[in-house]
């Protein structure tokens, strides 16, 4: 996901990390997050220029490039750290994201209900350097074919 958002026009900053764990005072490690006991989700922090890119466009890209219908799973990766989540920093972002998910479910945009967690951001910690550059080529190819108009 980090590799995708780095290519989006209007995105200013992207970094991989961990969001919304149970112990928000202690920075988690990848090994700790993988135990499934920290409550943290693997996440990508995205800072964007709203005058160049609408939040709904970011949401469209997010939902088109992962499976938001399987709880605590992405592909072969299983565990609460792999949950689909949107963690917002403002009440407006929260309302937009909640409305977007509700509309996806109302429109039956996916073969199963969207189970993406939408919540205020309570904590974000950057991932260790070795975990920040993983790229999944098929995901990037899907993005470039569907969202060429949004690319830098």
Model regions and ranges:
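Flexible coil/turn and secondary-structure edge motifs
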Residues: 1-152
């Amino acid at each position: 996901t980090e590799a995708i958002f780095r290519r989006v026009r209007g995105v200013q900053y992207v970094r991989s990390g961990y969001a919304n764990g149970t112990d928000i005072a202690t920075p988690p490690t990848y090994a700790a997050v993988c135990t499934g006991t920290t409550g943290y989700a693997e996440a990508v922090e995205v800072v964007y220029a709203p005058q160049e890119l609408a939040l709904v466009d970011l949401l469209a890209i997010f939902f088109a490039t992962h499976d938001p219908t399987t709880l605590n799973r992405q592909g072969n990766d299983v565990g609460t750290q792999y949950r689909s989540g949107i963690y917002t920093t403002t009440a407006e972002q929260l309302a937009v994201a909640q409305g977007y998910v509700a509309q996806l479910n109302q429109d039956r945009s996916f073969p199963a209900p969207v189970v993406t967690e939408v919540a205020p951001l309570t904590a974000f910690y950057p991932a260790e350097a070795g975990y920040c550059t993983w790229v999944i080529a098929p995901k990037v190819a899907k993005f470039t074919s569907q969202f060429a108009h949004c690319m830098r």
